[in-house]
C-alpha cells in the first residue's frame, strides 16, 4: 500500500535541530530538476539544496555568478513539485542580496512565493548580517554559508582550502556566531580544515553541514552529479563517488545509436 502524501512526515528546520541535539547526522544533496529531486526524496535524503551550482552543473558556466534569480526560481519550482519529505533550501544567487537588505528581502520573498521553497541560503558573515535579520524578520528561514564561498571566487582568486591561517579562522568563528545570533537555522561550512569545523560545530547550537570540512560536523552535503560520477573531470579530495554514471549513460546511448543504425530498434514488440 502506498503512503498518502499527507501522511509523510516532512523534514523541518526544527527537526534538523533535534537531529543535531541527539547526534544524528544530517544528509543533504543538490537537485535542480523534478526527476532527480523525486529520486533523492524517495531515497530519504533529509535536505535538498537547489544550489547556484546549477550555474556550473546545468549551464556549463565556470562560476556560480551568472545564474539569475529567475533561473533559481525555475529550478526550485521544478524540485518542489517532486518533494514529499525533504526540506528544500534554495541559494540566493549572486547579486540578489549583497549590500542591500531590502533587495535581499525582495529576492527571498520571490523565491518563497514563486517556487514554494522552505528556506534560503546565503554566503557571508558579518557583511550580510542586516540582510539575514531582515529576511528572518519576514518569517523566512535562512541557512548560512562560510569558508570557501563560490560567489566570492574573484575575491579569493582560487578554490583552495580556506581559513588555514589563524586570523581567517578566528574571523570564520566570529562570523559563525554572528549568523547564529542573527537567527540562522543552520550553517554550511565549505572546504575548511577539519579541526576548525569541529571547533565551530562544538561552539554553535545550530547544525553545521560540511562539504570538504571533515567528519566532525552535524551533516554532509555533496553535489549529486559529482556523487553519481556524472562529471568525471571533477576530483576534489573531499569527493566520494558512489557510481560511475558517465560510463553507464555513455554505454546506454552508444547501444541505442547502434540499434537505430542497425535497424534493431524498434522491434515488433515495441510497435503498436
UniProtKB/Swiss-Prot annotation:
Catalytic activity from the UniProt record: 3-methyl-2-oxobutanoate + (6R)-5,10-methylene-5,6,7,8-tetrahydrofolate + H2O = 2-dehydropantoate + (6S)-5,6,7,8-tetrahydrofolate
Main localization, broad class: cytoplasm
Cofactor: Mg(2+)
EC number(s) recorded for this UniProt protein: 2.1.2.11
Swiss-Prot/TrEMBL keywords: Cytoplasm, Magnesium, Metal-binding, Pantothenate biosynthesis, Transferase
Gene Ontology CC: cytoplasm
GO biological process: pantothenate biosynthetic process
This protein's pathway: Cofactor biosynthesis; (R)-pantothenate biosynthesis; (R)-pantoate from 3-methyl-2-oxobutanoate: step 1/2
Cofactor details (free text): Binds 1 Mg(2+) ion per subunit.
Localization per Swiss-Prot or TrEMBL: Cytoplasm
One GO molecular-function entry: 3-methyl-2-oxobutanoate hydroxymethyltransferase activity
Binding site for Mg(2+): 52, 91, 123
Entry annotation: catalytic residues: 190 (proton acceptor)
Annotated binding of 3-methyl-2-oxobutanoate, by residue: 52-53, 91, 121
Subunit organization: Homodecamer; pentamer of dimers.
Similarity field: Belongs to the PanB family.
Function recorded in the entry: Catalyzes the reversible reaction in which hydroxymethyl group from 5,10-methylenetetrahydrofolate is transferred onto alpha-ketoisovalerate to form ketopantoate.
HAMAP family xref list: PanB (MF_00156)
Name assigned to this protein: 3-methyl-2-oxobutanoate hydroxymethyltransferase
